[in-house]
């Protein structure tokens, strides 16, 4: 089995500069011989203050074909601080993320 690469990334500090981030990430991927990234959003909720990440704003920025919201991989402790630690909503959903990364690999595309 081939190794898959899935990158993690936090949007903190990129709220008003998301377009520049996407442009830079695409340039890096192209320089390494890859197609543009698929962005997977694992936030439980998308109600934030960061301008380009409120609701579906980031999806609108990158386009529907380059964005997936997988909130089942979100941290329940964001909504319920009494949990006190990271608690993934549906850990088994990680398998869907791996399946998606495998499909992207066939297209010479990586996942962030």
In which residue ranges do the predicted regions lie?
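Residues lining hydrophobic/aromatic ligand-binding pockets adjacent to catalytic sites
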Residues: 1-112
